[in-house]
Amino acid sequence: MPQNKGPFYMTTAIAYTSGKPHIGNTYEIVLADSIARFRRQEGYDVFFQTGTDEHGQKIELKAEEAGITPKEFVDNVSGEIKRIWDLMNTSYDKFIRTTDADHEKQVQKIFKKMYAKGDIYKGHYEGMYCTPCESFFTESQLVDGKCPDCGRPCVPAKEEAYFFKMSKYADRLIDYINTHPDFIQPESRKNEMMNNFLLPGLQDLCVSRTSFKWGIPVDFDPKHVVYVWLDALTNYITGIGYDCDGNSSDKFNKYWPADLHLIGKDIIRFHTIYWPIFLMSLDLPLPKQVFGHPWLLQGDGKMSKSKGNVIYADELVEFFGVDAVRYFVLHEMPFENDGVITWELMVERLNSDLANTLGNLVNRTISMSNKYFNGVVENKNVTEPVDEDLKSFILQVPKNVSAKMDKLRVADAITEVFSLFKRCNKYIDETMPWALAKDETKQDRLATVLYNLVEGICIGASLLKSFMPRTTERILVQLNANERTLEEMEQFGLYPSGNRVTDKPEILFARLDLKEVLEKVEKLHPKKEEPKEEPKEEVEEEKTENVIDIEAKPEITFDDFEKLQFQVGEIIACEEVKKSRKLLCSQVKIGSQVRQIVSGIKAHYSAEEMVGKKVMVVTNLKPAKLAGILSEGMILCAEDADGNLSLMVPEKEMPAGAEIC
């Protein structure tokens, strides 16, 4: 058993009970599960909490539409969410519901304590409200009159409400973020929170509602219900036994503060601004890290039922199996940029990575062991230089995986594991067991080769457990082997010499035919026929030379020109400026620096398209604020007569920071 490294408390965001979760929602619980499982492998005493967020006006309206009570509605949806989490083989320790009696009681006590402390006061709210997002906005925050977060219409709202004094703790939070560089990850999320919200100044937050009833009542003013975010965020402490009166459980004292809150990038503001400030009000330590993961997109954008592009986890499992789906969502998601899932990509990954690289390796190794030695795997120690190369490569992989997981680079970690399987496949090509089998004098060498393969697969399968736990079990059962600890993976040769593998190897992952899969998907989700356009008459256009004349600006001297500094920049992150129809906010690497630059190119490039591009930047412009966001340079573009923009990019590969002269 690995040594006990102490407690490790991690959470996901609790899922909102407005409907069945799609694969984009499910990605988070699978990601969290892989981290929790790996921390357990390392020897941590992990407590992993997830659950459901069950109050709010949106749920009240949906229950009314369904003709049932809100409690009946959330019971059904919460049960469905838990079913999906269990289907995906996630190893959570607690599934909390915000309708749990102990949670509701503590939320009332927390609200009362904040009120008694003077952090909450009664006032009136007048503004715009987005029901789906459960969020208030001022008129200036709307985009084209609609919600800046989801794009749906907002409705005027005027009501008595309680407010939390956010500004009271703002400076303290800014100082905390500056002195705890790992608190908000990835780095680009921290820059967004600081520049877009904290530095411009915080407004007081509405923390109660009177226009609906489905919520936790404020016990000293029961016509008010507690605003959903104060209710939902406190689950992270109530779920492990926090008590506002000082009678917290041993579990709370053991595990708080949380080591990791894993959440979607769209709710990072609530977790890195509202939540820490609530904790400061309660005199509780802040969580050690909040990681805002990217979205899993379905080909043409973020999944939503209104777009009709939703893929559900249980449908994917029916086609591919649990571990194949886990592998895909973990492998395909970059560290901070959105990933893409399509049926075509799923089939491609299953066939190439799972059926070929992994499945074929295991099957070939077991089959050769049975064919040549009746399943007995014996180390005859007849070695060649290629064996040492294999061993050194394999022994390095667990170290690489640990380093990646420490940084939450899960996609990179699982890629490292599969590099081990690829190296074993290469070893087969290098040693050619089929040729050794034909030479009676090479039988001990053949046995050694097969032993090395089985040993390598055992280490790889044990490393795979955090990501594909059932596949690990299936491989080790066929090899008649025990799972290795991380400490044991520091040695090569622990597989018992003379052990016997199964004589009936099973196929881990069968190859799939893309056409057949797509035909089944079509039956599951028939496409709606789009209206056909009437054929347009062809009009012969006069060809013109592709040039454009612009009005000349006044001449400048060479000395004036030399004052400007132009450099190549690499865009490492990019987000939409939600209050603007035109602006994107990019994090641009220029040499060893990372600068924030706001550009009016949203109509021409998506944030996803921008990431990874090398662009030309004016780097010595005086910083200025655009839409309240600090911009530290200018990205250069060309514009045609129709107003279309094109980024100015280097013709050849150039390093970030290269001077443009």
Give residue spans per PLM region.
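Intrinsic disorder at enzyme termini
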Residues: 472-560
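Beta-strand segments within the central parallel beta-sheet cores of soluble alpha/beta enzyme folds
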Residues: 289-292, 476-478, 585
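Structured secondary-structure scaffolds
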Residues: 2-50, 102-106, 150, 156-371, ...
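Phosphate-backbone binding interfaces of nucleic-acid-interacting proteins
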Residues: 536-661
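Cys/His-rich short segments
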Residues: 117-170, 174
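Helix-rich, typically C-terminal accessory recognition domains appended to large enzymatic cores
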Residues: 122, 345-382, 393-501, 618
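A glycine-rich helix N-cap at a beta->alpha junction
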Residues: 78-93
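N-terminal catalytic cores of NTP/NDP-binding nucleotidyl/phosphoryl-transfer enzymes
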Residues: 2-77, 96-111, 116, 133, ...
